[in-house]
Curated annotation (Swiss-Prot):
Name recorded for this polypeptide: Enhancer of yellow 2 transcription factor
Native organism taxonomy: Eukaryota, Metazoa, Ecdysozoa, Arthropoda, Hexapoda
Cited function: Involved in mRNA export coupled transcription activation by association with both the AMEX and the SAGA complexes. The SAGA complex is a multiprotein complex that activates transcription by remodeling chromatin and mediating histone acetylation and deubiquitination. Within the SAGA complex, participates in a subcomplex that specifically deubiquitinates histone H2B. The SAGA complex is recruited to specific gene promoters by activators, where it is required for transcription. Required for nuclear receptor-mediated transactivation.
Keyword Lyase set for record: no
Record InterPro entries: TF_ENY2, TF_EnY2_sf
Primary location: nucleus
Classification via PANTHER family: ENHANCER OF YELLOW 2 TRANSCRIPTION FACTOR
Keywords noted in UniProt: Activator, Chromatin regulator, Cytoplasm, mRNA transport, Nucleus, Protein transport, Transcription, Transcription regulation, Translocation, Transport
Intracellular or extracellular location(s): Nucleus, Nucleoplasm; Cytoplasm
HAMAP family for the chain: ENY2_Sus1
Presence of keyword Nucleus: yes
Superkingdom of this protein's organism: Eukaryota
Annotated GO CC locations: cytoplasm; DUBm complex; nuclear periphery; nuclear pore; nucleoplasm; SAGA complex; transcription export complex 2
Organism in which the protein naturally occurs: Drosophila yakuba
Database matches in Pfam families: EnY2
């Protein structure tokens, strides 16, 4: 299991995943990322025409790499620090539980 998969599984089990996801959503909204991506989607749909032959899956495939590059470094760093804090706190709690008789 990769480190990212282990962290993902751990945060789901502890209930911290939803907190991290909520933080990410709020930060992306605050910095205008969601509006940028929404505009990008709109522009792509206008370019591709209105004949409904462009699927949601195709839109996601085209937008995802561009959208990922638009996430501000500050947001990435904040989330990484939050994840590290959660893992550290939970590791300390586990160590304390092992020490108890």
């Amino acid at each position: 299991m990769s480190v990212s998969a282990a962290v993902d599984q751990y945060t789901v089990l502890t209930g911290d995943r939803s907190k991290i996801k909520d933080l990410l959503c709020s930060r992306l909204t605050e910095c205008g990322w969601r509006d940028e991506v929404r505009l990008m989607c709109r522009n792509i749909l206008l370019e591709k025409g209105t004949n409904n032959s462009f699927t949601v899956e195709q839109l996601i495939t085209e937008v995802t790499p561009k959208a990922r590059t638009l996430v501000p470094d500050a947001v990435k760093k904040e989330l990484l620090m939050k994840i590290r804090t959660i893992l550290t706190e939970n590791e300390e709690e586990a160590d304390e539980a092992e020490e108890e008789p």
